A protein has these predicted regions:
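A conditional alpha-helix N-cap/helix-loop micro-motif detector
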Residues: 38-42, 85, 154
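Residue-level signal for short, function-critical loop segments
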Residues: 64, 109-111, 141
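A generic local structural motif
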Residues: 44-47, 89-93
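Short, glycine-/small-residue-rich phosphate/pyrophosphate-handling segment
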Residues: 90-131
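Glycine-rich phosphate/pyrophosphate-binding loop and the adjoining helix
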Residues: 114-168
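Hydrophobic/aromatic beta-strand patches that form the interior of the parallel beta-sheet core
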Residues: 2-4, 59, 104-106, 136-138
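Conserved nucleotide-sugar donor-interacting segment of glycosyltransferase catalytic cores
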Residues: 73, 77-92
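N-terminal beta1-alpha1-beta2 submodule of the flavodoxin-like/Rossmannoid cofactor-binding fold
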Residues: 1-62, 67-78, 159-168
């Protein structure tokens, strides 16, 4: 089991430095000719892509922040949404290359969205895009909306998690 703590571990964000490093490599530059920072960012980016590809199962847990996924989760998704590695372009459109994997997305929401929020749809959409067809979702919802039911809502989520765990 490999655990990534997105706010503790180094997750490179796509920025000007990373883009210019990739551009230099595409133009024929040697990896060692890039700045040390570019080399580190590109190496880490590739390491995270390879880690994702090597995993049999993917579990993503996040809170809904301002009706979206946390920014570090978006940065991680950039490392697993890579043309030529996790998907390819065909004459019929993009095709996912990551097959035979399962994913579980666990998300806590202060309100109740029943999977209709943008964040959970984005997570499932990106995983489907790269070829992961089985994406189970577990929502821990409504605790901010109805704090008097917090224990009950948490127990319901734990029961659902136990049921999902049997087939995951």
């Amino acid at each position: 089991v490999t655990v990534l703590e997105l706010y503790r571990d180094d997750i490179p964000e796509i920025d000007e430095e990373l883009l210019s490093g990739w551009e230099a490599l595409r133009a024929g530059a040697e990896f060692t000719s890039l700045s040390e920072s570019q080399q580190q960012k590109i190496a880490r980016f590739n390491e995270l892509t390879d880690q994702f590809l090597a995993a049999d199962k993917i579990v993503i847990a996040n809170a809904l922040w301002n009706l979206n996924i946390p920014t570090k989760l978006k940065a991680w998704f950039d490392t697993v949404n890579v043309a030529g590695k996790t998907f390819r372009y065909t004459e019929n459109g993009p095709e996912g290359l990551v097959t035979g994997k399962k994913a579980l997305h666990i998300q806590s929401n202060g309100g109740v969205y029943n999977g209709q929020d943008f964040a959970s749809q984005y997570v499932k959409g990106i995983l489907n895009f790269v070829g992961i067809d089985q994406v189970d979702q577990l929502f821990i919802e409504g605790i901010d909306y109805d704090p008097d039911r917090a224990d009950e809502l948490m127990q319901n989520a734990l029961d659902k998690a136990a049921a999902l765990g049997k087939s995951f």
